[in-house]
């Protein structure tokens, strides 16, 4: 039986100066995606993907780590200026936005909230009783 060859996928460097950072902060997790201006994904990260499990995924610290990981990946592709689009009501939302400003060599152009608001659409989940 022949041995399988392990082929490593080569990371292609894209020299992109401007990008958009999408932060999706849910109650359970925080996802960060960095795209170019056309919407093609360059880098992404999430709190769960970094090893945070269970209730630790929804913490502000996990959101900060996810943003720093995604921005470091994006800096390898030459990103220098970003616009931020935030979605969702999660607890890591504010920390994620602040930590983008703290990344060295990245200039924030704008900040926009793209959370969808229902005009009396679906019934929301029932209130929690703890």
Curated annotation (Swiss-Prot):
GO biological process: translation
GO molecular function: rRNA binding; structural constituent of ribosome
Keyword vocabulary terms for this entry: Ribonucleoprotein, Ribosomal protein, RNA-binding, rRNA-binding
Gene3D superfamilies associated with the record: Ribosomal protein S11
Superkingdom per UniProt: Bacteria
InterPro entries (alphabetical): Ribosomal_uS11 (IPR001971), Ribosomal_uS11_bac-type (IPR019981), Ribosomal_uS11_CS (IPR018102), Ribosomal_uS11_sf (IPR036967)
PROSITE patterns per UniProt: RIBOSOMAL_S11
UniProt xrefs under SUPFAM superfamilies: Translational machinery components
Any single Gene Ontology cellular-component annotation: ribosome
Similarity comment text for this entry: Belongs to the universal ribosomal protein uS11 family.
Function statement: Located on the platform of the 30S subunit, it bridges several disparate RNA helices of the 16S rRNA. Forms part of the Shine-Dalgarno cleft in the 70S ribosome.
NCBIfam families with a match to the protein in the record: PRK05309.1, uS11_bact
Subunit and interaction comment: Part of the 30S ribosomal subunit. Interacts with proteins S7 and S18. Binds to IF-3.
Full protein name: Small ribosomal subunit protein uS11
Organism from which the protein derives: Campylobacter fetus subsp. fetus (strain 82-40)
